[in-house]
Each structure stands twice: as structure tokens, then as C-alpha cells.
């Protein structure tokens, strides 16, 4: 005979264990974790009121623990709400973290980590070849053939090191959006200006008439955090929603870090909301499944090709790669005027973001656009990598 008291204790313990949130072990062996910094994601269906109540409770718990133990943790830093996907980032002591994990409204918690650009600077002044390549089936042409609508009426968010919005290549089409990295609203690195010029520059870009928004999530050294990137994505979705341009927007993320479920969830929500999302596969010549946001199934993950239609030696590969695009020795704008040449999957991704905006301008649906680009693409890449597509970006020009 089962003792009812014992059974009730067992069931209570089981229920408590079942309610405890998951602490996700993220990244790969080279990931740089940020000590005592955590991203907390709420369960689907948690209302805004319940979320606010939870945040208030956590702030109170942290304040009590900090006073009791004299820790130097900062507590709550920023909140996220991407189409009802709710969460926050904070700097918490172990006791506060335990309280968070035991809250039944929390889905999972992961430690924040460093994220970096996916570009490699090379020499200045080299000739660019990517525009000609993506508008011709055969390699070798320097002519870019495209519909003159060129992304008109579409907005591209450059989630990066910032953008020199006054550069002549943008002709007044660029504006500053937000900065989650630091207090300096400028591109002190050059990476973000280069990628923006590739996706929408007048001289160097794919979608020459698209609007451009600078979303700074990485600092002058090219690094940032997963939480900062999620905050940038949060801004993009809310801005597009407020401006009524969901379905007429694209986003480029030429960056990456170790695997992060929260990062993947954030870009997935953006994609599902009606923003076409292109991301860099990464530059370690490894399987992109171990990187985020490259491993998110919903986004368009881009590997890098050379002028000879080979996989760039540095490019990540694998089954999560959706498409190849030019990424070696790409010339585009640099802050302050003029141009420079960079290489990386960072340079490949904005070709696809720009092509996404170009196609949206012609009536394509952002939600199914990556599949459309894969259908149009040319099966041209030699030695693409294990279990990796050989398809190279093409704009359907007929050339």
C-alpha cells in the first residue's frame, strides 16, 4: 500500500523539478563566456503583465542578495520583446540565478557570450567582382545587370559596428537606428559601413535604392555580446512594426559566436515577423551548425565564395548553409569616404541581404525568400564542403 503522505511529497518534488527552467550550455570550445551575465527567456504565452511582475520580482531579489552578500553584480540590464518572445539580460549572483531558474514562467537561461564580426580586412583599392558574378550564370563578367527598381521602398537593417550614414555611397538613404554596444554613434571599425555599402550602396551595392538603418551592436574592436545583438534585433522588429514595413524589410548580421538558443530564437522571430534575415556562416572553416545565428534554421545562412567559384578557404560550411555568395576581396565603402577591400563571410552575407531587398522590391515574400533565392541560384561552387550546397547567389537577370 502506498503512503499518501509520501506520495504527495514525491509529486510535489516532481512538479517543482518539472517547473524548473533549463540552463542551456551553449557555444563551442572556443566560445568566450561573459562571467555572471545571463539571458533569460520566458515561456511562450507569458503575458506582458506577468513578465513585468517577474522582472520586478527579480530586481527585488537581486537587490536583497546584493545587500546581504556584498556582491558587485549590476542586476537587470535590458529587456526584450520580439513579437511576444519575451526575455531579459542581467548581471546576477548565483543565488539570484537560482531564484530565476525556479520560476515556472521561465523557459530557459543561458550565459551571455562574446560575438564577433565575420570579416577579415585585406588591402585597399582592389577591384570588386561580386556584383557582376551574382547577375551572370557564368563567371568573368564585370557588368552588373539588374532591375532599376533596385530595392526601392525596402529597408535594410545593418546589425553591425555602426554605419557612416553620411558616406557618399548612401546618397542620403541611411539613418541611425540604435546603439546597444557603447555610447559612440559612429562606425569606428569600418565593418558595418562596408557591409551596408555591399547590400545597398549606390556604387558598390546590390539594392541601390533601398533605405538603410544603422543598428550598432559591436564596438570598435569588432566584438559585442549575444545580449547586445538580441537587443539590436528587438529594435529592428519594433521599428519595422511601428513604421508599418514588416514585409518590406531585410536584416543583415555579418557576425557570429558560439551556439546560442536565445540568439537563434531572436532571429527566428524576426524572420517570422516579415523581415528577411541574412547571416554570415562564420570564418573558421568549420561546421556552421556550432555557430549562432548561423545555425538558426529559419534564416538565410551564407557561405563565402572566391572569384573562381571555389569555397573561400576560411568559410564555414555544413548542412545549415543555404547559399554561397561572393566574399573574398570585396570592395565597398569605408568610414570617412572612399573604399576598402575586405574578405569574409561578412562580405558574402550582405550580398544576400541586398538581394533579398531587391527581390522584396519586386514583390517577393520575405518569409519564403531564402527558398526562392536557392531556386534561382547557380550550381557553381567547387568543393563546397561536406554536406554543403554548391549553389551560388544569382539575381535572375537572364544573363
Curated annotation (Swiss-Prot):
Instruction: Write down the glycosylated positions.
Output: 102, 252, 308, 395
* CDD domains given in the database record: Peptidases_S8_PCSK9_ProteinaseK_like
Q: Superkingdom of this entry's organism?
A: Eukaryota
Q: Does the keyword Ribonucleoprotein apply?
A: no
Task: Name the GO cellular-component terms.
Answer: extracellular region
Q: What class of enzyme is it?
A: hydrolase
User: Where is each Peptidase S8 domain found?
Assistant: 128-399
Question: What is the predominant subcellular site recorded for this chain?
Answer: secreted
**Where is it located?**
Secreted
Q: Where is the active site?
A: 160, 191, 346
Signal peptide from the UniProt entry: 1-19
GO molecular function terms listed in the Swiss-Prot or TrEMBL record: serine-type endopeptidase activity
Q: Which InterPro entries match?
A: PCSK9_ProteinaseK-like, Peptidase_S8/S53_dom, Peptidase_S8/S53_dom_sf, Peptidase_S8_Ser-AS, Peptidase_S8_subtilisin-like, Peptidase_S8_subtilisin-rel, S8pro/Inhibitor_I9, S8pro/Inhibitor_I9_sf
* SUPFAM superfamilies attached to this UniProt entry: Protease propeptides/inhibitors (SSF54897), Subtilisin-like (SSF52743)
Q: Which UniProt keywords apply?
A: Glycoprotein, Hydrolase, Protease, Secreted, Serine protease, Signal, Virulence, Zymogen
The EC number(s) attached to this protein equal 3.4.21.-
Q: Which GO BP terms, alphabetically?
A: proteolysis
* Positions of the pro-segment in this chain: 20-118
Please report the stretch or stretches of sequence annotated as the Inhibitor I9 domain: 38-117
Functionally, this protein is described as follows:
Secreted subtilisin-like serine protease with keratinolytic activity that contributes to pathogenicity.
Q: Provide the family line.
A: Belongs to the peptidase S8 family.
UniProt-recorded name of the protein: Subtilisin-like protease 4
Amino acid at each position: 500500500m502506498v503512503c499518501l503522505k509520501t506520495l504527495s511529497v514525491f509529486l510535489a518534488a516532481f512538479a517543482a523539478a518539472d517547473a524548473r527552467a533549463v540552463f542551456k550550455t551553449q557555444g563551442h570550445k572556443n566560445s568566450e563566456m561573459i562571467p555572471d551575465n545571463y539571458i533569460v527567456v520566458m515561456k511562450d504565452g507569458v503575458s506582458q503583465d506577468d513578465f513585468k511582475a517577474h522582472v520586478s520580482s527579480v530586481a527585488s531579489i537581486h537587490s536583497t542578495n546584493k545587500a546581504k552578500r556584498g556582491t558587485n553584480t549590476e542586476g537587470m540590464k535590458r529587456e526584450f520583446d520580439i513579437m511576444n518572445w519575451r526575455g531579459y539580460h542581467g548581471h546576477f549572483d548565483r543565488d539570484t540565478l537560482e531564484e530565476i531558474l525556479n520560476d515556472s514562467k521561465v523557459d530557459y537561461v543561458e550565459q551571455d557570450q562574446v560575438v564577433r564580426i565575420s570579416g577579415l580586412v585585406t588591402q585597399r583599392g582592389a577591384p570588386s567582382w561580386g556584383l557582376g558574378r551574382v547577375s551572370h550564370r557564368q563567371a568573368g563578367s564585370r557588368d552588373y545587370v539588374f532591375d532599376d527598381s533596385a530595392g526601392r521602398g525596402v529597408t535594410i537593417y545593418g546589425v553591425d559596428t555602426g554605419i557612416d550614414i553620411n558616406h557618399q555611397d548612401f546618397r542620403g538613404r541611411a539613418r541611425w537606428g540604435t546603439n546597444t554596444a557603447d555610447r559612440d554613434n559612429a562606425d569606428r571599425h569600418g565593418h558595418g559601413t562596408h557591409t551596408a555599402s555591399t547590400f545597398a550602396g549606390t556604387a558598390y551595392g546590390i539594392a541601390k535604392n533601398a533605405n538603410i538603418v544603422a543598428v550598432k551592436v559591436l564596438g570598435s574592436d569588432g566584438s559585442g555580446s549575444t545580449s547586445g545583438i538580441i537587443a539590436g534585433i528587438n529594435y529592428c522588429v519594433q521599428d519595422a512594426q511601428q513604421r508599418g514595413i514588416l514585409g518590406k524589410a531585410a536584416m543583415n548580421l555579418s557576425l557570429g559566436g558560439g551556439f546560442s538558443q536565445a540568439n537563434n530564437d531572436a532571429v527566428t522571430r524576426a524572420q517570422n515577423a516579415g523581415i528577411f534575415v541574412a547571416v554570415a556562416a562564420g570564418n573558421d572553416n568549420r561546421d556552421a551548425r556550432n555557430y549562432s545565428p548561423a545555425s538558426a534554421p529559419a534564416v538565410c545562412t551564407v557561405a563565402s565564395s572566391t572569384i573562381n567559384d571555389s569555397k573561400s578557404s576560411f568559410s564555414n560550411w555544413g548542412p545549415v548553409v543555404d547559399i554561397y555568395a561572393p566574399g573574398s576581396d570585396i570592395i565597398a565603402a569605408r568610414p570617412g569616404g572612399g573604399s576598402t577591400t575586405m574578405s569574409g563571410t561578412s562580405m558574402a552575407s550582405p550580398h544576400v541581404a541586398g538581394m533579398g531587398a531587391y527581390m522584396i522590391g519586386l514583390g517577393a515574400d520575405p518569409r519564403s525568400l531564402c527558398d526562392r533565392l536557392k531556386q534561382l541560384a547557380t550550381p557553381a561552387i567547387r568543393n563546397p564542403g561536406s554536406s554543403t550546397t554548391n549553389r551560388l547567389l544569382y539575381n535572375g537577370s537572364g544573363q
